[in-house]
Regions:
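Flexible "cap/lid" loop of the alpha/beta hydrolase fold
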Residues: 113-158, 185-192, 222, 263
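Active-site loop/oxyanion-hole signature of alpha/beta-hydrolase fold enzymes
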Residues: 60, 64-94, 108-111, 132-136
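Conserved HGGG/HGGXW glycine-rich cap/lid loop of the alpha/beta-hydrolase fold
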Residues: 33-75
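Conserved loop-alpha-helix segment in the C-terminal half of the alpha/beta-hydrolase fold
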Residues: 209-235, 241, 254
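Short beta-strand/loop motif that positions the catalytic acidic residue
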Residues: 205-207
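Conserved alpha/beta-hydrolase catalytic His-Asp/Glu region
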Residues: 152-197
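Gly/Ala-rich beta-loop-alpha elbow adjacent to hydrolase catalytic centers
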Residues: 96-101, 105
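Catalytic active-site module of serine/aspartate enzymes centered on a nucleophile-bearing elbow/loop
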Residues: 231-266
């Protein structure tokens, strides 16, 4: 199922989008909702602070939200950092990953505290696959260029950063992201996964329709393969920052859905 959130310049339309993202019935989560925890995993080239808008929207509605700071030094290190946070959750959680964070949650999501997965313009390899394989048969948009450093880490090309990563952010915000990049060990993209949590956990996907980090066909194909419920949002790859209400709404929907399923099965 695909939900599309369409933006227009009119204030009334903007208000409508916010209303659609957070219906009146979703002001706070019910006292008896089983899934009340959310764990957020950032992607490459950024850190966890970019989740602030999503964090605040979910906390306002009663969720306990934890943001993982993955080191981006290897898949194993990033998964270990995520598992460390999952171990601290007081109950079932929705695990969310953006971009490279999707690979991380795919591996870490087999943790028993994970009730569901949300992929935010994110990668979702299968067990035995690596991240680089997900690009096969697809063409990466020319705006997204990774500059390899001599020590094996990669940065996004600074001249193309805004166009490739955060085209819908303000010039100032995009410049700050560019200047505060966190490089990723490029070898991480070649590491094969041992687990694919989406094979046993329900999944949702946010697809940014103006994403220049991935080919749109690639995003759609990955979401279809994992059986994700898809929400399309008109945004750049930085959708988690530029459209936090829409992203938070999908996470909220996932938590409510998994909780309702648990109640029905009891």
């Amino acid at each position: 199922m695909i939900t599309t959130l369409r933006a227009t310049a009119a204030a009334a339309a903007v208000a409508g989008i916010i209303s659609q993202a957070w219906p009146a019935s979703a002001e706070t989560i019910p006292d008896d909702q089983a899934v009340r925890n959310v764990v957020l995993v950032h992607g490459a080239f950024v850190d966890g602070s970019g989740w602030r808008g999503v964090h605040d929207a979910l906390v306002a509605r009663g969720y306990a939200v934890t943001i993982v700071q993955i080191p981006l030094t290897s898949l194993a290190d990033d998964v270990a950092a995520t598992v460390r946070v999952l171990d601290r959750q007081p109950g079932p959680a929705i695990l969310v990953g953006h971009s490279w964070g999707g690979t991380v949650i795919t591996e870490a999501g087999v943790h028993p505290n994970v009730a569901g997965l949300v992929y935010v313009s994110a990668l979702s390899p299968d067990a035995g696959e690596n991240t680089a394989q997900q690009y096969e048969g697809h063409t990466t948009p020319p705006e997204f260029v990774i500059d390899a450093h001599g020590d094996g880490f990669g940065f996004l090309n600074p001249e193309l950063f805004k166009a490739g990563f955060a085209a819908d952010a303000s010039d100032a915000d995009a410049a700050f992201l560019r200047d505060s990049q966190v490089p990723i060990a490029l070898s991480a993209f070649e590491t094969r996964l041992e687990n694919a949590a989406w094979r046993t956990k329900p999944s949702w996907a946010v697809i940014a329709t103006e994403d220049k980090a991935f080919d749109q066909a690639m995003l759609q194909a990955m979401a279809a393969r994992i059986g994700a419920i898809v929400t399309e949002v008109p945004a750049s790859h930085a959708v988690f920052m530029t459209r936090p209400l829409e992203v938070a709404a999908v996470i909220d929907t996932a938590a409510r859905s998994v909780s309702q399923q648990a109640q029905t099965s009891n």
